């Protein structure tokens, strides 16, 4: 049975942990507001680019941009995995790594068996996981979310598009967390390349393109890819902060329950010690009288 001193030490330790988790929850909440704002602000621009590309895709031949050309046989695959740099965010990284693993070993099992699956990992957790297990990690961006910048998204998009144009890969898939709400992030494995031909055609009046749809699409496609990757990174960052805030809130509540139980145990042990001392005093007094 633990002594009063042991229980006091545990209470002190739990209180210290509770203060840390509470502070981390507040920090995550502040970061979430900022990350959510950035993700929401990026959506309209990405949607408009997608709309324009949808309007153009029906007016040009796929030869206008090799990134529009579909390849039926996905025998060489590039997986872009977006995880977090740090832990203490619940099952955020575990779930997204599981999805990436399942995508590689189920959807692209033949390509993996032939050694034709490569990865680009944005975020320390995913990078460390797949590198240590012997996967072909083409590029890693550890600690990328410490200072999230558009240049990283552009570099990833340019690397992926260059490999696709050169025929080094037949499919580019991005695995990430899409931010829907604090309690409902969505795991996604989205095909980035080839660009899907079923992009939504712009509603309403048609656009007039100068100098030509083919010339514009050549400029528009790289911007679209850059924006898509950037948006995915922003979504993942917001989902990470939401997961961390939720995890730290749960940890704080668990610490509160643990403290309640420890205080009850402490009071019972203290009461038992006092009762024992009183019994010894009474027993000693009786012995003296006799």
UniProtKB/Swiss-Prot annotation:
GO terms for biological process: proton motive force-driven plasma membrane ATP synthesis. Belongs to the ATPase gamma chain family. It is a peripheral membrane protein. The keyword Ion transport applies. It comes from Chlorobium luteolum (strain DSM 273 / BCRC 81028 / 2530). It is found in: Cell inner membrane. GO terms for molecular function: ATP binding; proton-transporting ATP synthase activity, rotational mechanism. Disulfide bonds: none annotated. InterPro entries: ATP_synth_F1_ATPase_gsu, ATP_synth_F1_gsu, ATP_synth_F1_gsu_CS. F-type ATPases have 2 components, CF(1) - the catalytic core - and CF(0) - the membrane proton channel. CF(1) has five subunits: alpha(3), beta(3), gamma(1), delta(1), epsilon(1). CF(0) has three main subunits: a, b and c. This is ATP synthase gamma chain. GO terms for cellular component: plasma membrane; proton-transporting ATP synthase complex. Produces ATP from ADP in the presence of a proton gradient across the membrane. The gamma chain is believed to be important in regulating ATPase activity and the flow of protons through the CF(0) complex. SUPFAM superfamilies: ATP synthase (F1-ATPase), gamma subunit. Keywords: ATP synthesis, Cell inner membrane, Cell membrane, CF(1), Hydrogen ion transport, Ion transport, Membrane, Transport. NCBIfam families: ATPsyn_F1gamma, PRK13425.1.
């Amino acid at each position: 049975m633990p002594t009063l001193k042991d229980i006091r030490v545990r209470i002190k330790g739990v209180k210290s942990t509770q203060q840390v988790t509470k502070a981390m929850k507040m920090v995550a909440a502040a970061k979430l507001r900022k990350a959510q704002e950035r993700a929401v602000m990026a959506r309209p621009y990405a949607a408009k680019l997608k709309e324009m590309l949808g309007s153009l895709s029906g007016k040009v031949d796929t030869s206008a941009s090799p990134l529009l050309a579909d390849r039926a046989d996905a025998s060489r695959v590039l997986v872009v995995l977006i995880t977090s740099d740090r832990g203490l965010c619940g099952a955020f990284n575990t779930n997204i790594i599981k999805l990436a693993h399942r995508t590689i070993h189920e959807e692209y099992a033949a390509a993996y068996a032939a050694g034709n699956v490569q990865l680009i990992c944005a975020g320390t957790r995913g990078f460390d996981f797949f590198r240590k297990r012997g996967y072909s990690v083409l590029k890693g961006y550890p600690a990328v979310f410490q200072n999230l910048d558009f240049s990283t998204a552009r570099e990833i998009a340019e690397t992926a598009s260059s490999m696709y144009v050169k025929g080094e890969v037949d499919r580019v898939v991005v695995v990430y967390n899409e931010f829907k709400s604090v309690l409902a992030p969505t795991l996604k494995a989205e095909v980035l390349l080839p660009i899907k031909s079923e992009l939504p055609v712009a509603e309403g009046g048609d656009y007039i393109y100068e100098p030509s749809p083919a010339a514009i699409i050549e400029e528009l496609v790289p911007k679209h890819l850059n924006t898509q990757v950037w948006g995915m990174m922003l979504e993942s960052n917001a989902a990470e902060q939401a997961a961390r805030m939720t995890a730290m809130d749960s940890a704080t509540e668990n610490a509160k329950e643990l403290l309640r139980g420890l205080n009850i145990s402490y009071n019972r042990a203290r009461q038992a010690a006092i009762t024992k001392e009183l019994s010894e005093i009474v027993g000693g007094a009786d012995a003296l009288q006799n």
